UniProtKB/Swiss-Prot annotation:
Keywords: Acetylation, Activator, Cell cycle, DNA-binding, Nucleus, Phosphoprotein, Transcription, Transcription regulation. This is Transcription factor Dp-2. Residues 60-82 are annotated as: Interaction with CEBPA. The lineage of its organism: Eukaryota, Metazoa, Chordata, Craniata, Vertebrata. Coiled coil: none annotated.
Length: 446
């Protein structure tokens, strides 16, 4: 009722001094003080936007604090929410204090909460100091030091470090566990996308940082030589197994023919059971032999050099392998040897018949004969009778190591170079604006 008498409210009890729509609402609290009027001596009538001189006798105060709109007309009592003493501000004082013009939607700087801006700047500083880049570096160091780890192990250690009271960090820069675990999750995804780490189920393994082209080329050359040596070892093992099969089957056929000629098996004292070993030494060598009671263990002591030959070596010297290991195999023996192995391995018998040089065949840099008839785009062998199956299979193995390029195929050249591409070309730089946007996103990837 008092506010209505002094002209601050309209007839329907609305605050008339705060109806102007050009002003934006303030976030602060404005204190309004309404005084009951005991006696007024103003004979003039109060017009809508003018206030005449008023003599007011002040009684008990009632403070109403509510966020409302500011007005540019009339006299109001405003006060800071932090100081209880009200102050009288007239129309001209409000215009000078706020400094706004009609149409300007920005609030006066005087009414901005300074504490809010300081906390925002503090939060921004913490975010720049402990963002995704910072946690990526920490996670990278953890995984590199451990070699093999898991997400929970890395996250638990980082949570322990950042929440440890002994850590010299500011009190307002402490991170909650959920935020740290989310940052660790994002950092692991970034490192995995850059091929720095690998993840299989819950196991995380360290691969390595991207290197320059020279070092990558050197590493590829070392890997290439290692694979070539492995191919040679596999070829030697395959050759030994094929020769054993040929020797055993050839021995079986010979014994079968002898039984047919002699019309019965040979005498027991004239046969040697497989497997066996033969020890060869000089006639002047003194041999001390000890045999266990069960005759399963033998101990030999020699005072001179000696040789040990197994049954396969003996069969080779007997000619049961048709001389394939030395490259002295006739066409008839080669045909017979092919009949003793599966059809899929006949091509390797032809390669073995060339001698020990077969172990290095197709692995030299200047030797492209084995891949000249190989379609690199599909990995299939072109139908030519002059190319045997063994060489084609070797070419496929060599091609997998990046050794060969087709001489007349530009497409295959680009494909091979793409396979040996350096990991250093993986984009590893991030935009600062994108990083800030990611950090402002509060949604957890979990």
């Amino acid at each position: 009722m008092t506010a209505k008498n002094v002209g601050l409210t309209s007839t329907n009890a609305e605050v008339r001094g705060f109806i102007d729509q050009n002003l934006s609402p303030t976030k602060g609290n404005i204190s309004f003080v309404a005084f009951p009027v005991s006696n007024t001596n103003s004979p003039t009538k109060i017009l809508p936007k003018t206030l005449g001189p008023i003599n007011v006798n002040v009684g008990p105060q009632m403070i109403i604090s509510t966020p409302q709109r500011l007005t540019s007309s009339g006299s109001v009592l405003i006060g800071s929410p932090y100081t209880p003493a009200p102050a009288m501000v007239t129309q001209t004082h409000i215009a000078e204090a706020t400094g706004w013009v009609p149409g300007d939607r920005k609030r006066a700087r005087k009414f901005i909460d300074s504490d809010f801006s300081e906390s925002k700047r503090s939060k921004k500083g913490d975010k720049n100091g402990k963002g995704l880049r910072h946690f990526s570096m920490k996670v990278c160091e953890k995984v590199q030091r451990k070699g093999t780890t898991s997400y929970n192990e890395v996250a638990d250690e980082l949570v322990s470090e950042f929440t440890n009271s002994n850590n010299h960090l500011a009190a307002d820069s402490a991170y909650d566990q959920k935020n740290i675990r989310r940052r660790v999750y994002d950092a692991l995804n970034v490192l995995m996308a850059m091929n720095i780490i690998s993840k299989e189920k819950k196991e995380i393994k360290w691969i390595g940082l991207p290197t320059n082209s020279a070092q990558e080329c050197q590493n590829l050359e070392i890997e290439k030589q290692r694979r070539i040596e492995r191919i040679k070892q596999k070829r030697a093992q395959l050759q030994e197994l094929l020769l054993q099969q040929i020797a055993f089957k050839n021995l079986v056929q010979r014994n079968r023919q002898n039984e047919q000629q002699n019309q019965g098996p040979p005498a027991l004292n004239s046969t040697i059971q497989l497997p066996f070993i033969i020890i060869n030494t000089s006639r002047k060598t003194v041999i001390d032999c000890s045999i266990s009671s069960d005759k399963f263990e033998y101990l030999f002591n020699f005072d001179n050099t000696f040789e040990i030959h197994d049954d396969i070596e003996v069969l080779k010297r007997m000619g049961m392998s048709f001389g394939l290991e030395s490259g002295k195999c006739s066409l008839e023996d080669l045909k017979l040897a092919k009949s003793l192995v599966p059809k899929a391995l006949e091509g390797y018998i032809t390669d073995i018949s060339t001698g020990p040089s077969w172990l290095n065949q197709g692995l030299l840099l200047n030797s492209t004969q084995s891949v000249s008839n190989l379609d690199l785009t599909t990995g299939a062998t072109l139908p030519q009778s002059s190319v045997n199956q063994g060489l084609c299979l070797d070419a496929e193995v060599a091609l997998a190591t990046g050794q060969f390029l087709a001489p007349n195929s530009h497409q295959s050249s680009s494909a091979a170079s793409h396979c040996s591409e350096s990991r250093g070309e993986t984009p590893c730089s991030f935009n600062d604006e994108d990083e800030e946007d990611d950090e402002e996103d509060s949604s957890s990837p979990e």
